[in-house]
Amino acid sequence: GADIIVLYKEFPHTDVVERAEDLLDLVLATLRGQVKPVMSVYDCRQIQSYPTTLQPMRALVDRIKAMEGRDGILSVSIAHCFPYGDVPEIGTRVLVIADGDKKKADALATALGEELVGRRGKTAPPAFDVPTGIAEGRAFNDLPVVIADPADNAGGGAPSDNTDILRHLIEIGAESACLGPIWDPIAVRLCFDAGLGARIPLRFGGKIAPTSGQPVDAEVEIVGLKRDAWQSFGPTQVPVGDCAAVKVGGVEVVLIANRTQATGLELFTNLGIDPRQRKLVVVKSTNHFMAAYGPVAKKVIYVESGGPLRRDHRKVPYVKAERPIWPLDADAKPRGLVF
């Protein structure tokens, strides 16, 4: 088995380089005989989302960072769990590495694990239905308002072509709105064939699954085209492939060829759309979008579209998840220390 494991602390996962450096430092210190790592793991038996851009997780992550390198604690990690990974091992765990003191590692892992159990249902922001969320965004007196569509997040395995929010924006005649990404390689190809500035009848989105909603049929203006585009995510670049922006009424829609979620502002700026100057910015993402959009958003609203990634994990059709586990089982108890 492994002697040292270091996990991301941040969600969005913008700390990949920092955690790699932490891991390397611990490995080198161990090889030099400077420390003797011992690990403890506490199993909370819960499925939950823990965005570290918001409280209470922001404060907790700052606390565990401050613990490292003091009083014999070498590393502290919280394995959030991937809620849509239907595997027996699903669930939140706390991992503590201490310098030769198993009891100290056990005690801290237990304390942090019990703290997370006490925060069941209290770490993720609320989500609204589509009409309510959009109405709240339109009523807000500043811009931009970022509307998150986590149910159709490609990062969680969704197709990223659900049209519920887009269709609602079109129906209510929304202005100064942009939305993306919608994964539709065929529509992108048609836009390139037609050319920048063309007006064409286009059917797009709503193709892949029953949860995708209905395709949008509209007369669109092609307002942006870019080959082999990318968007940022922390220090990395995420390829989106060929992409096109089409305008339907007052809504600009980003269509992409490579299925991925919204992470960087470049998703829009690649195509001449400045999301900082739009009233409503709809992003298909759960929380990774916050790395770039959080600092510019005047307000962030989560809505629940008809996409397949249910925020209420009791509605996820798990087959392999080991039971009992909260919230599938309301009375699930933490397993406690597993090593």
What positions do the PLM features span?
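Internal gly/pro-rich beta-alpha loop/helix module
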Residues: G1-V35, Y42-Q55
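Structural alpha-beta junctions
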Residues: A2-I4, R70-D71, H168-C178, R276, ...
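Conserved acidic residues
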Residues: D3, V145, K279
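Short, acidic/turn-prone active-site loops that include or flank metal/cofactor-
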Residues: K9-P12, F204-G206, G306-P308
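Short gly/pro/ser/thr-enriched loop/turn and capping motifs at secondary-structure boundaries
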Residues: F11-E18, P185-A187, F289-M290
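Flexible inter-domain linker/hinge segments
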Residues: R32-L74, E89, K299-I301, S305-F339
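Hard-cation-handling environments
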Residues: Q48-G250, V254-L255
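Extended hydrophobic packing segments that form well-structured cores
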Residues: V117, W230-F339
